[in-house]
Amino acid sequence: MDWFVFFVNSILFIVPVLLAVALLTLVERKVLGYMQLRKGPNIVGPFGLLQPIADGFKLLIKETLKPSNASPYLFFFSPVLFLGIALVLWSVIPVKYSVVSVNLSLMLIIGLSSLSVYSLLGSGWSSNSNYSFLGAVRAVAQTVSYEISLGLILLGVVLFAGGFNVEVIESSQSWSWLMFSCFPLFAIWFVSTLAETNRAPFDLTEGESEIVSGYNVEYAGGPFAMFFIAEYANIIFINLLSVLLFLGGSSPMGEFFPVNVLVVSLKAGVLVLLFLWVRASYPRFRYDQLMYLTWKKYLPLSLSFLVFFVVLLGVLDSLPPSSCFL
């Protein structure tokens, strides 16, 4: 019976994620179209609403090709691993019927997200292509570099909230969102999430003018669709995590279902639209600028904020209790 409940909860998580990914592909093309003074998809279905279904069907019926010199097992296992990690990450999101309940959910998120590096490296190496391998090396270096800053920011959030549980962090912002009290930290977090998800202007792993398409250049059909779904699922997830960590989660509506879900979805949708606005507005960075930003700017700033929070909490703990609270 427990396995049946686990299976049902997993399906209830996976299906909305896939639907959200399909909707995001349509919204992205529409938003970019209007920002570039064109209409975007408007042929398939009313107002182009069925365009994601047509795109998905097209990818599924395409032939799955493998380069003759590619490593067959790792070549096909890498997209499966990438998609699996992207979907498993959603299981720790605190909802009414969670798939798993972990006290150290934030640590689990950090650990699982770091595993995606192996799928990117495996796909680039197993393709036996120079473009794929260069894209994979870029992706690994970029992801590992920005994960350090993200980890330090998360430690600062943990110090403020007093726990590694996402639910504890969300409930600690019932009166004031962490974004207001630590806006510089939130700004660094937001830009780092752009780099972590390989989005513009940090999409150097898929630099069309340099390495064609990056680590997935040799993929087609179903395996390419797995990479595509995983990338967009990660975009939605990282913005949902930003809402829970910095924007108070379902605050100010509390835990009233389904109002809380609508509030969180609305906040995450606004952040996703910011992702799309950045893509439409800014050109791609050079690779040296990307690395300079994280190692020379964000890493010292994140570490400085963390040290400041530790010292501040130590000073506040050493102060005697005020007489007005006695």
UniProtKB/Swiss-Prot annotation:
Gene coding for it: ND1
Role this protein plays: Core subunit of the mitochondrial membrane respiratory chain NADH dehydrogenase (Complex I) that is believed to belong to the minimal assembly required for catalysis. Complex I functions in the transfer of electrons from NADH to the respiratory chain. The immediate electron acceptor for the enzyme is believed to be ubiquinone.
A Pfam family: NADHdh
Gene Ontology biological-process annotations: aerobic respiration
Keyword tags: Electron transport, Membrane, Mitochondrion, Mitochondrion inner membrane, NAD, Respiratory chain, Translocase, Transmembrane, Transmembrane helix, Transport, Ubiquinone
EC numbers, comma separated: 7.1.1.2
PANTHER family reported in the protein's UniProt record: NADH DEHYDROGENASE SUBUNIT 1, NADH-UBIQUINONE OXIDOREDUCTASE CHAIN 1
Cellular component aspect of the GO annotation: mitochondrial inner membrane
Species of origin: Patiria pectinifera (Starfish)
Alphabetized InterPro entries for the sequence: NADH_UbQ_OxRdtase_su1/FPO, NADH_UbQ_OxRdtase_su1_CS
Primary location class: mitochondrion
Superkingdom of source: Eukaryota
PROSITE patterns on file: COMPLEX1_ND1_1, COMPLEX1_ND1_2
Catalytic reactions of this protein: a ubiquinone + NADH + 5 H(+)(in) = a ubiquinol + NAD(+) + 4 H(+)(out)
First-tier enzyme category under EC: translocase
Stated name of the protein: NADH-ubiquinone oxidoreductase chain 1
GO MF terms held by the record: NADH dehydrogenase (ubiquinone) activity
Annotated membrane topology: Multi-pass membrane protein
Localization: Mitochondrion inner membrane
Family per record: Belongs to the complex I subunit 1 family.
TM regions (residue ranges): 4-24, 41-61, 73-93, 102-122, 148-168, 175-195, 227-247, 256-276, 299-319
